[in-house]
Amino acid sequence: MPELDLELEQIINFRQYPIDNEVFIEQCATELDKKGVLTLPNFINNETLLELTIEAKENQFKAYYAKSTHNIYLTEIDTKLPPDHIFNYQVISSKGCITTDQIPENSKLKSIYGSIIFKDFLARVVNERKLYEYTDPFSSINIHYAKENQELGWHFDNSNFA
């Protein structure tokens, strides 16, 4: 494993979640395999969480808001199926979003996303040889905003894991 990044050590609760520890990584992978989900409460320390919350609020004015409908598979309506078929059932997404290029360069979100140790941890937990950064300059990191009566409609993600 790479040497621990001091900035990452100040972002993540390493005492509780030693993401560079072989035994911990194996425990996480086992839990994900058994339960289909891995939950790490308080993974990001409180100070960082507060900082990220303030940062998100300060940048909310940059958000693009949109309302759309989609099915749970995020695919087009299948005209071969009846309109009331579950595949064609439409849910609503009405939210705001800022994209990677709108997130401050010094954001700890970018530090986490770019961390080799964090990527190695995730790769091992999800049983991938290596994870790569998403090269889309807008979609690698997003902050979603939902005001009252706005929502992100339920859907299956397009990626293997989220």
Q: Where are the regions a protein language model picked out?
A:
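Fe(II)/2-oxoglutarate
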Residues: 1-34
